[in-house]
């Protein structure tokens, strides 16, 4: 599915634009997606993921090897 983080699963949300006159029109809040390449030391190759900024922080915290193994366990990579 388009515009969805491969790690966290975050996708677009729906909300309202609110004008000064308090008129409301529908809008979409899109996730901050980035294409990033990550080096897997164990496999000696690059992995390209479409991730949000929150997922980048998660990868910094737990490591790319752990994140990729979790994705493979879910069957998403």
UniProtKB/Swiss-Prot annotation:
It comes from the Bacteria. GO terms for biological process: translation. This is Large ribosomal subunit protein bL28. It comes from Methylibium petroleiphilum (strain ATCC BAA-1232 / LMG 22953 / PM1). It holds the Pfam family Ribosomal_L28. The keyword Ribosomal protein applies. One of its GO terms (cellular component) is cytosolic large ribosomal subunit. GO terms for molecular function: structural constituent of ribosome. Disulfide bonds: none annotated. InterPro entries: Ribosomal_bL28 (IPR026569), Ribosomal_bL28/bL31-like_sf (IPR034704), Ribosomal_bL28_bact-type (IPR001383), Ribosomal_bL28_sf (IPR037147). The keyword Ribosomal protein applies. Belongs to the bacterial ribosomal protein bL28 family. Keywords: Ribonucleoprotein, Ribosomal protein. NCBIfam families: L28 (TIGR00009).
């Amino acid at each position: 599915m388009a515009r969805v983080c491969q790690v966290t699963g975050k996708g677009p949300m729906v909300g309202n634009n609110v004008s000064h006159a308090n008129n409301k029109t529908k809008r979409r809040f899109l996730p901050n997606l980035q294409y990033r390449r990550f080096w897997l030391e164990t496999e000696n190759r690059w992995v390209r993921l479409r991730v949000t900024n929150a997922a980048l922080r998660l990868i910094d915290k737990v490591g790319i090897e752990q994140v990729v193994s979790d994705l493979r366990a879910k069957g998403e990579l």
